[in-house]
Each structure stands twice: as C-alpha cells, then as structure tokens.
Amino acid sequence: GYYPFGRDEEYEMELLQVINQTMEVDIPTHLQANVSLGKKLKSLLMVVAKSVPFKPVMQRLAEATGISRNDIPDYLVYMERAGMITQLRNSTGGIRGLGKVEKLYLDNTNLIYALSPEHADIGNVRETFFMNQMRVMNDVTSSSISDFEINGKTFAIGGRKKGQKQIENAEEG
C-alpha cells in the first residue's frame, strides 16, 4: 500500500488520524500558528476533496473556508509539501518559476476514498493515480489540449471508450 499501515485492519481509521495530525497539528506547528488554523486547513482540504480535480478560484475557496484569499495559495503549498494535495501547474513559469495552478488533486487515491468516497469518480481516480506516479521522476504540467504534458508529450487519461480524439492534434500524444 501507499502508506506503511496499508494492510492493517484499522487502515481507514489510521489514515484519517494521519490526515488530522498533518492538518490540525503538523502544519500549524510548522507555521507557528494557533490551533484554529488547523481547523481551517482541514476545512480547505475537505473542499478540495469534494471538488477534485478542479481549477482553484481563490476567492471561492476563501468564502468556503473563512481563510483569507491572500493566504490560500501559501496554505495550498504547505498542504502539498505535507503530501495532502498536488497542484498541477501550467508550464509558463512566472515570477517564482512556478506556473499558474490549473488543477488541484488530492495527493493519492487513498485520500480520495478516505475523505470523499462519494466523489471517487473513476476518471478522477485515474488522473490522481497518473499524477501521483508520474510526478516522482517527471515535471508534470497541464496540457492546453488534454490532461497532462510531460517533456513535450501529451497524455489523455481515460478508459477504454475515451479514444484518441483529445490528443489527435498533439505533436506527441
């Protein structure tokens, strides 16, 4: 399994404990923030869990969580570093050398099933798995014509019936 306790009988409970520890204790402690931040971060994670994959609109996330719109991008970075989410960026670069965030994903498929099983759409699960596996050794960016781009190659993630239409105009698809 993805986590060292993946075969334990109490797997789901243990995973939820890891999530709670990370969001409510670890990140706020690292930021030297108060306990109330942990609750807001967990709220942000749940909004992401129920919406993924989606293009983040900071104002809407702020309204849904009570977190300042200006703080949300930083908190998303901390959540990403903690292994809770993944941010798919475009390849433009920008001031910080990071492209604009195009989509948010939960970090791995286990988190999908633990946090929001009712939103465990198979397409979401496929994209999350692809992103989780490919980003280890590759710089994965969003594609303007499909789902992902890696080293100039375009990837469309789908089931048997998806076909090639989405990537037919890709130079390398």
Regions found by a protein language model. Give the residues of each.
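Catalytic cores of nucleic-acid endonucleases
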Residues: 141-145, 158-173
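Proteins with a high burden of low-complexity, intrinsically disordered sequence enriched in S/T/G/P/A and R
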Residues: 1, 31, 156-158, 165
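Conserved catalytic cores of phosphodiester-cleaving nucleases, focusing on short active-site segments
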Residues: 130, 134, 148-163
